[in-house]
Amino acid sequence: MIQVENLSFSYQNNKVFKNLSFSIKKGEYLCIIGKNGSGKSTLAKLLAGLIFKQEGSIKISGYDTKNQKDLLEIRKLVGIIFQNPENQIINTTVFDEVVFGLENLATPRENIKEIAENSLKSVALLEYKDRLTYQLSGGEKQRLAIASVLAMGTEILIFDEAISMLDPVGKKEVLKLMKELNSQGKTIIHITHNRNDILEASEVMVLSNGEIKYQGNPYKIFEDDEFNPFLIKIKNILEKNNIKIDDKNINMEDLVRLVYENIS
């Protein structure tokens, strides 16, 4: 469904990606994880067709993001939910929020009510359809943003740090919904910096400095020392101080003190 080949992208003369290649199958639940600045959000926008001045190719169900005509189809197929739902919804009723997007797509008027209600039902918000959007909780606002995306006929949903600002209840609600949508055949791409978010995914991609360090089983992230953030910090401290762990002349007390002073 998604094929990325030799993707390179620069922002303000800084190389974000260089020759990135990967594929995402239809109906997959992929979690993309990485530190701030690793290129996760840029990749999300590229996949959604919001940025398209790149080298290499991105094809979504055969549509090419570099083709202006194809971009219109891609933006119907791919929906993106951002970190702050306040930036995606307007101050109106829950029902009218979904209707607004459908009207912009020139959806036949006789179909709008049914599509909007079905979308709200799919995210358990139909009973709130007459409520004003500002009265919703954070989790409910994200579910409304998802409903608006689903109403467009979206097959691929990208969640760009979409649960990072929610309270525990809201996070649980949205994660459950993501899993349900995936079980219905939707392709889910969940972008996060929190390793605990990846366990529901069928596959995980680790991004670091614009490169794919790993793509595969999410449980490897917890098992492999290469992805242990504590061990990575220690390794960076040693490298910064030109210390090799197999050096027989290392004073262990000095080493422990050095790590303790720099590990925060």
Curated annotation (Swiss-Prot):
InterPro entries: AAA+_ATPase (IPR003593), ABC_transporter-like_ATP-bd (IPR003439), ABC_transporter-like_CS (IPR017871), ABC_transpr_CbiO/EcfA_su (IPR015856), ECF_ABC_transporter_ATP-bd (IPR050095), P-loop_NTPase (IPR027417). It is found in: Cell inner membrane. GO terms for molecular function: ATP binding; ATP hydrolysis activity. Its EC number is 7.-.-.-. ATP binds at residues 34-41. Its main location: membrane. Gene3D superfamilies: P-loop containing nucleotide triphosphate hydrolases (3.40.50.300). SMART domains: AAA. GO terms for biological process: transmembrane transport. Residues 2-234 form the ABC transporter domain. Keywords: ATP-binding, Cell inner membrane, Cell membrane, Membrane, Nucleotide-binding, Translocase, Transport. It comes from the Bacteria. It is a peripheral membrane protein. One of its GO terms (cellular component) is plasma membrane. Forms a stable energy-coupling factor (ECF) transporter complex composed of 2 membrane-embedded substrate-binding proteins (S component), 2 ATP-binding proteins (A component) and 2 transmembrane proteins (T component). ATP-binding (A) component of a common energy-coupling factor (ECF) ABC-transporter complex. Unlike classic ABC transporters this ECF transporter provides the energy necessary to transport a number of different substrates. Belongs to the ABC transporter superfamily. Energy-coupling factor EcfA family. This is Energy-coupling factor transporter ATP-binding protein EcfA1. It comes from Fusobacterium nucleatum subsp. nucleatum (strain ATCC 25586 / DSM 15643 / BCRC 10681 / CIP 101130 / JCM 8532 / KCTC 2640 / LMG 13131 / VPI 4355).
